[in-house]
Amino acid sequence: MKQLHDLRALPLVSIAAMMAAVPALAQTNTSSLDHEVVLSDLDAPWDMAFLPDGTMFFTEKCHGLSVRLPDGTVNALLGVGDTAGYATNGEDLFCEGQAGMMGVAVDPDFADNRRIYVYSTSNMSDPHTNRLMRFEVNGDLTDVSGRTDLVDDVPYKMEATDQPFGGPGAHNGGRVAFGPEGHLFLTTGDNHNAEVPQSPTMMGSKVLRLDTDGNAAEGNAPPEGFDPRTYTYGHRNVQGLAFHPGTGTPITAEHGPWHSDEITVLENGGNGGWDPRPNMAGRGDCPDGYCGYEPNQMEGMNRYERRAYMPMTDFETYPDAMPPIWTNNGWSQGISGAAFLEGEAWGDWEGAMVVSYLGIGFGGTPVGERIDVVELDEGEISVFDVTEMTLPMESQRFRALATGPDGSLYVSSEEGMIHKLTPTD
């Protein structure tokens, strides 16, 4: 599948910044794939994290945190609200709209400290917030204890607004991951609040880089006046985060506002360039003060016109914004998960990035439920090639990707399944 970029209707500065994002002609699969359904009948599985022996922690948005042991046994650890069947329940945790239990990460020193980290929505405060919590897992992996709320001030959307997908609980980000240097990363979203992305103090629309106690990681370099936990800001709703295997550089996958899904190489202190405020960049007022969906609420705009009217990365206003290395040919198809393929069995794709899509099938947008393999140039992090993976199962709304310790690619779907894809000769 060839991915090109129609650069009409873009400012010249945008064209210059995006020229590097045009990949070459895609190749075919380098290997065939074996397919196994690891789990099914789940409630919107959101994320996965592994121990070296193949033990898999996973979250379900409205149910909670569970663990699958290597023998296939599943233990339900932490329930959302009063969800039955869990060893422990977080009574303040709830799900609504896009919100609920989202990301999970395993501490690099888990063998010694038994710690895991979970990002979930909480009604402990009013207004409600999204929280990054730390727990200890007991020795036989049947329960968690010792809850510590490391980050308790990520905003949550309390009320419905006049936008598509405008209900409560929108745009929370949600990915939690450890970088190769041991820092803990958390991605957050804009809640359909136009003031959040460029705010120095509101913790939505950010990528936070933390130590394991929730403090700002040493070396963070946000602009003056910003919360020191900020690694990057000006994001819309990052849900994909992975680290380049050669450099350790964090790379995000972020779905756009009915145009321009993006893959972006993060820069410490960088601005993602998302600013949906009214009366900016030539725009006037917008419904409920949020312009992020306004072009979608106006008839007759194609994806290029929408991109020019409400840019995902606004280079005119923020000429030093981090440029995306790929923009999905101007479409927004719900890019979500991100990972890197590991192991020689992947052939030419070893070390390539993979991204998943939830799919959006209205307003002229192709549905796009798929997994793409994004090959990066050696020596610099730019896109060389993008190939749609030929899947041995039917496409679904693919939420998350994770590389297991066995080198297989694990894929969660909104249809309640976790798939395992293993390359074969």
Model-predicted regions and their roles:
Residues 27-195, 248-252, 256, 331-379, ...:
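Acidic, Gly/Ser/Thr-rich repeat motifs that build Ca2+-stabilized beta-propeller blades
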Residues 174-176, 240, 399-401:
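Short, surface-exposed beta-strand/loop micro-motifs that present aromatic residues
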Residues 22-26:
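Sec/Tat signal peptide C-region and signal peptidase I cleavage site
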Residues 2-12:
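Bacterial N-terminal signal peptides that target proteins for export
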Residues 85-95, 99-101, 109-111, 131, ...:
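Beta-propeller domain segments
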Residues 11-21:
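Bacterial N-terminal signal peptides
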Residues 34, 161-162, 227, 387-389:
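Short, flexible loop segments at the rims of nucleotide/cofactor-binding pockets, characterized by
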Residues 381-405:
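Conserved blade-ending motifs and adjacent loop-strand segments that build the rim/top face
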